[in-house]
Amino acid sequence: MAAVAGLYGLGEDRQHRKKQQQQQQHQKEQLEQKEEQKKIAERKLQLREQQLQRNSLDGYGSLPKLSSQDEEGGAGHGFGGGPQHFEPIPHDHDFCERVVINVSGLRFETQLRTLNQFPDTLLGDPARRLRYFDPLRNEYFFDRSRPSFDAILYYYQSGGRLRRPVNVPLDVFSEEIKFYELGDQAINKFREDEGFIKEEERPLPDNEKQRKVWLLFEYPESSQAARVVAIISVFVILLSIVIFCLETLPEFKHYKVFNTTTNGTKIEEDEVPDITDPFFLIETLCIIWFTFELTVRFLACPNKLNFCRDVMNVIDIIAIIPYFITLATVVAEEEDTLNLPKAPVSPQDKSSNQAMSLAILRVIRLVRVFRIFKLSRHSKGLQILGRTLKASMRELGLLIFFLFIGVVLFSSAVYFAEAGSENSFFKSIPDAFWWAVVTMTTVGYGDMTPVGVWGKIVGSLCAIAGVLTIALPVPVIVSNFNYFYHRETDQEEMQSQNFNHVTSCPYLPGTLGQHMKKSSLSESSSDMMDLDDGVESTPGLTETHPGRSAVAPFLGAQQQQQQPVASSLSMSIDKQLQHPLQQLTQTQLYQQQQQQQQQQQNGFKQQQQQTQQQLQQQQSHTINASAAAATSGSGSSGLTMRHNNALAVSIETDV
């Protein structure tokens, strides 16, 4: 029985050897096919280099692209049996070689001279676009937006005209412009075409302390402290406006009594506030903050002349000046109350002086209302409104001009139409201007109305003309407002959101061979782990089992071979990345990949030879064990021999 079992085990061993030989033959055929493909690709690159050399020597354009038969069959033969020569075709332009660009699977073809028009861009610079070159497919690959590349390629073909496709969002196209490195000039031109007005660059102070103070008061978004300062400024502005309105209430007014005659008195409002007045004290606190803010901003500004020319700073100055004039008036009245000798003044001069001073004080108090425009520094809505009015000055001028023509025309018409009526409200043409303005703006107070039939007809025509006149320029003003509003919101969204698009995976030097090495290395290591798990989980296979001792050297050899391969891979990657990409041509890149793949094949062959030697030693050991088992007649040893043979064959198959 033992001899039969040994013969049965040898038969299985032969079958496994046969399968192993078939697998090795299949692997050898695959390697030969890969080598043929590499030779063909290398031949293509050599032909392309020869074409470029001929072009540089002869001064002509590039050669026409070879046919597939010429590329695959090497150097073709002409009709006479000799080698066929490709003569360059004369051109008027250089760089007529066609370039294939693959954008997410969509292939584009263009001429090299088209891309070379913009050498500072990604596609125009040979060193930069070489990172994305695939030598096996002989094309450049970009994993980017396909619809956007139509406009990018048209930018090169048209000589610098950039047009965004309708189906591409604005943010996506902006990212594509940045990726292809078209430059700041192209980006600014694109933003102008899309309606984004280029904002003027606001310089910062050179001194570090001045820069911090300037950012603190001028840019509320720069820090948390700047936001606090902005909130305080807004609160003080609102408080001053509320005080300005509340002090005009009758219960808060101050009155003076004047003796006009012997038995007559006159009561008038006191235009000069008292120093102890609560409103005046609050106004003083607000002015202290406004003055402090304006002074600090002036001292920290980078350009004093531009600071004085700014409209917002002029408004700040106008909002402060009335207080100091009022304060000077209060101090002057306090001096008048003192019993000091004064020159006699006539009653007429005194009344005229009082009227003049009251008029000046009222104008000064009116100027305080301009403080409300200080809110525009902290309000995006007011800034948009100001930009809209500034951009619509022409339309507003046309509106006022049309209203002026209508007012003159219809006020004259209604005056002559109502001239014969006894109860007419229109005493003169200038007196009818008010009625024409109120009617054309469709307000209609009713204080002046036509009485006669002809006057009513003129009033009807005036109302219709006013509706048409006002309605014509209003849509243009509204469209300007929508434009500035959407532009502001789009800019805020682009600044607040970070668009994380899929970036291209460039073909860096050596990446083609490294991927194959890493995959083969991971597969071999996973196979070793599975083999080790299988050995440990095999029933009856203990540490003293002969199968364990036969497998252990093989696993140790594989682990020792894995470490130098991984270290050599990392060293080769580091060395290749240290070389400047500008000095690598397509031929050098491919030659490096060929050398790496050749080293991989040599290592694989050495590993295969070592494995075969180990298997031969294991087979001789198992044959000796089977012979010993046959002589002893032990059934258990025959079973052990079969188990060892099966284990050795499984090891050889996995390798």
UniProtKB/Swiss-Prot annotation:
Changing residue 489 to A: In RNA edited version. Residues 1-224, 301-311, 379-393, 486-655 are cytoplasmic. Coiled coil: none annotated. Residues 430-441, 442-449 dip into the membrane without crossing it. Residues 519-528 have a biased composition (Low complexity). GO terms for biological process: action potential; axon extension; behavioral response to ether; cellular response to dopamine; courtship behavior; detection of visible light; larval locomotory behavior; learning or memory. It is found in: Cell membrane; Membrane raft; Cell projection, Neuron projection; Perikaryon. Changing residue 464 to V: In RNA edited version. Residues 1-188 are annotated as: Tetramerization domain. It is a multi-pass membrane protein. Residues 26-47 have a biased composition (Basic and acidic residues). The keyword rRNA-binding does not apply. Disruption phenotype: Hypersensitivity to reactive oxygen species generated by the redox-cycling agent paraquat. Reduced sleep. Flies sleep for one-third of the wild-type amount. They perform normally in a number of tasks, have preserved sleep homeostasis, but are not impaired by sleep deprivation. They also have a reduced lifespan. Males are able to discriminate between males and females during courtship but their courtship of females is reduced, suggesting that their perception and/or response to wild-type female pheromones is decreased. One of its GO terms (molecular function) is voltage-gated potassium channel activity. Residues 1-87, 515-548 are annotated as: Disordered. Keywords: Behavior, Cell membrane, Cell projection, Glycoprotein, Ion channel, Ion transport, Membrane, Potassium, Potassium channel, Potassium transport, Transmembrane, Transmembrane helix, Transport, Voltage-gated channel. A motif (Selectivity filter) lies at residues 442-447. Expressed in mushroom body (at protein level); this overlaps with expression of qvr/quiver/sleepless and nicotinic acetylcholine receptor (nAChRs) proteins also involved in sleep regulation. Expressed in the adult brain. Enriched in the mushroom body, anterior optic tubercle, superior protocerebrum, antennal nerve and visual projection neuron fibers projecting into the lobula plate of the optic lobe. Glycans are attached at residues 259, 263. Pfam families: BTB_2, Ion_trans. Signal peptide: none annotated. The transmembrane segment S4 functions as a voltage-sensor and is characterized by a series of positively charged amino acids at every third position. Channel opening and closing is effected by a conformation change that affects the position and orientation of the voltage-sensor paddle formed by S3 and S4 within the membrane. A transmembrane electric field that is positive inside would push the positively charged S4 segment outwards, thereby opening the pore, while a field that is negative inside would pull the S4 segment inwards and close the pore. Voltage-gated potassium channel that mediates transmembrane potassium transport in excitable membranes. The channel alternates between opened and closed conformations in response to the voltage difference across the membrane. Forms rapidly inactivating tetrameric potassium-selective channels through which potassium ions pass in accordance with their electrochemical gradient and may contribute to A-type currents. Plays a role in the regulation of sleep need or efficiency. Plays a role in sexual behavior, where it is important for male sex discrimination. Belongs to the potassium channel family. A (Shaker) (TC 1.A.1.2) subfamily. Shaker sub-subfamily. This is Potassium voltage-gated channel protein Shaker. It comes from Drosophila melanogaster.
